[in-house]
Amino acid sequence: MIFATGVGGFETLADQVTVYNERGARRVSPFLVPMMMANAGAAHVSMRNGWRGPSETVVTACAAGTHAVANAARLVATGRCDVVVGGGAEASMHPVAIAAFANMTAMSTSGISRPFDMRRDGFVISEGAAALVLEAWDHAVARGARIYAEIAGSGSTADAYHITAPAPDGEGAVACMEQALLDAGLSAADIAHINAHGTSTPLNDLAEARAINKVFGEPGPPVTSTKGVTGHGLGAAGAIEAVASVMAIDRRLIPPTYGCEQLDPEVHLDVVRAEARPWEPGPVLSNSFGFGGHNGCLVLLPPAD
C-alpha cells in the first residue's frame, strides 16, 4: 500500500486548535495526533484489509499521487510484491487552508479552473481520492483480472529553485519527462498523449508548456488537463490523473480541457478543447509538478494484446 497526501489531516489539526483556544488543553482530542499524521491514510487502509506488506505514505506536495503510483509500480517491477495498491487522497478544504492558498495568490479569484487559457487566474482547490491496483502481468492474467493499462516507466526530479514557483526554464520538468521516457524505453516521438499538470496558474501552465515544447517540439502530442473538471486535488491529483489517463486509453477518447476556451498565445501546445478527441490509444505521459520543486511523471501504455 503506497498512498499519497499533500497536507494530511489538516482539518482535524485546525479544528483542534480552535478547541484548544476556546476550551483549553484538556479538551483537545487524544485522537488529534493519529488523525493529523500524513501516514494515516495508508495505515488505516492496511489495517482495515489486513495487508502486511509495505505500507508507506508519500508527501511531495502536488506530485505525491504520481510518486506514490510510481513507487508502487516499482515494488511490483522489482519482484518485491505481486500486488500493490498505489494512489492518493486529499481533504483540505478548511477555511484556514483556503485562506492561506488565497493569500499566496495561488488560488483563482474567479472560481473557474481554466488550464492554459489566457484568462486563467489560479487553481480551484478540490478534494478527492484515487487508487490503482498494480500487479505483475502474469499474476493479473492468472486470476483473470481485466487489465486496463501498463505502467512502463516513471521519473522523479527536483527544480531546486523555489518553495512554490516553478523554475522558469523548466529544466527540472524537462529532466523528469526525459527520465520517464528513458525508464519506459521510449522516445519523445512515441508519446501519443500528455495529461498535463495544468493547474490554471499563470506561472505553472506557461512553465509546463515550455518544458513540453523542449522535449516534444511544437506543438507536440495532444495535451489535456483534467483539472479543468476536477479542480486541483493537491496530493491526490497525480493519482486522479493517472486514472484519467487509464480511462483515456480504455475509452479511446482524450478528454477535453474544460475551461480552456481562449488558448494563451504563449502556449504552443495542441491542447484538446471543446470536446473529447477520438484517438488510437498509444503511450501516455502524465505530469505532476508540485510546490517545493517536486516533479513526477508516469508513462502508461495500452495493455498488450
Language-model features and meaning:
Residues A184-D190, P219, H268-D305:
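Flexible, low-complexity linker/loop segments at domain and module junctions
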Residues I112-L186, A192-H193, C260, D305:
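Condensing-enzyme catalytic core mediating Claisen C-C bond formation in acyl metabolism
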Residues E22-S29, H67-A70, R74, T78, ...:
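Glycine-/small-residue-rich "gating" segment that lines the acyl/pantetheine channel
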Residues P30-N39, E56-A64, T226-G235, E261-Q262, ...:
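Active-site nucleophile and cofactor-binding loops and adjacent substrate-binding regions
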Residues M1-T60, A89-A97, A188-N204:
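Conserved beta-ketoacyl condensing-enzyme motif
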Residues F10-T12, A91-P115, A131, G155-A175, ...:
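Active-site-adjacent elements of ketosynthase-type condensing enzymes
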Residues A38-A42, S46-G88, V124-A145, G233-I254, ...:
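Active-site-proximal alpha-helical scaffold in enzymes
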Residues M1, V45, G65, A72, ...:
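Conserved small-residue
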